[in-house]
């Protein structure tokens, strides 16, 4: 009797356990997991800001407040020299006016950015593309240069350096100073351009003497020349003079080069000029490179 009562109690407990767990086919509730939550898509990034508008006029020398006729010098591939070049600033319009041998006089009109554009004549005709060098990039205040070429071609046909000429009587007449300059230029045909070029000019103002050197390498798509080192020889400079000139001699190439220039800035703080050097390219062909230089006192 006791055994039968114990057996019934165990069976009853097992039945209760199975019912509570939903086993044995009972009516328990099955667990159904919730579906995963899909995160909201991230908002698209904002569009890039529009490029700054191209200015209508150049601001080459921001300190200018009145119309100015600059000193100008350079070379064109056709052989024209700086005597045929003129650059001036028109304060009434804010325009820089270029008069070059290969183009009608016209204003520089920025088209791609503040420094790259074209010369537009009085009739609105564009005949010459031009890029002006930002003077601040060369640590200059009163001087810079420009490359220009016909609008139907990309090869530079000319280089012009321009700036505010040092007045007579403002060049020091005592002491000495060294200037460092940057070169721009290439072969007249445009297949070679200056890859790297500098000049060092050392003036003894009291003695009226000039010494220095010019270094240049030329490079093209399939050609090149140099590097060349030229020493100044037969220099011409006198005490108080605003201009200077000389020849260029190198042991690396036959023939002589030449240069001439002038001081710029109120007290000869800067200078500019033009140069011409002989070269022999990688294929053994001789030629003559032309260009300009601009620099400042060290």
Description of each model-found segment:
Residues 17-20:
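C-terminal motif of bacterial Sec signal peptides marking the signal peptidase cleavage site
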Residues 2, 22-298:
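Mature soluble binding/inhibitory domains
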Residues 1-10:
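Bacterial N-terminal signal peptides that target proteins for export
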């Amino acid at each position: 009797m006791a055994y039968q009562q114990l057996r019934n109690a165990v069976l009853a407990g097992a039945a209760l356990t199975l019912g509570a767990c939903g086993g044995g086919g009972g009516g328990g509730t099955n667990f159904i997991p919730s579906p995963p939550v899909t995160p909201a898509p991230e908002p698209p990034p904002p569009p890039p800001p529009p490029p700054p508008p191209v200015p209508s006029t150049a601001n080459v020398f921001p300190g200018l407040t009145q119309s100015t006729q600059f000193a100008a010098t350079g070379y064109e591939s056709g052989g024209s020299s700086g005597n045929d070049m003129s650059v001036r600033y028109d304060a009434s319009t804010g325009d820089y006016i270029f008069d070059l041998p290969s183009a009608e006089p016209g204003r520089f009109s920025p088209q791609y950015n503040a420094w790259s554009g074209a010369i537009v004549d009085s009739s609105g005709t564009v005949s010459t593309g031009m890029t002006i060098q930002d003077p601040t990039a060369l640590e200059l205040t009163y001087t810079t240069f420009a490359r220009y070429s016909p609008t139907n071609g990309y090869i530079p046909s000319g280089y012009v350096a321009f700036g505010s000429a040092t007045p007579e009587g403002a060049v020091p007449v005592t002491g000495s100073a060294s200037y460092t300059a940057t070169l721009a230029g290439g072969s007249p045909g445009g297949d070679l351009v200056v890859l790297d070029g500098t000049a060092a000019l050392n003036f003894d103002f009291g003695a009226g003497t000039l010494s220095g050197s010019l270094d240049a390498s030329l490079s093209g798509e399939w050609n090149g020349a140099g590097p060349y080192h030229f020493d100044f020889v037969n220099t011409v400079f006198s005490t108080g003079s605003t201009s200077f000139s000389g020849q260029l001699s190198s042991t690396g190439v036959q023939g002589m080069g030449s240069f001439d220039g002038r001081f710029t800035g109120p007290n000869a703080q800067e200078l500019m000029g033009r140069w011409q050097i002989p070269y022999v390219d990688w294929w053994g062909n001789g030629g003559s490179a032309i260009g300009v230089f601009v620099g400042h006192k060290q």
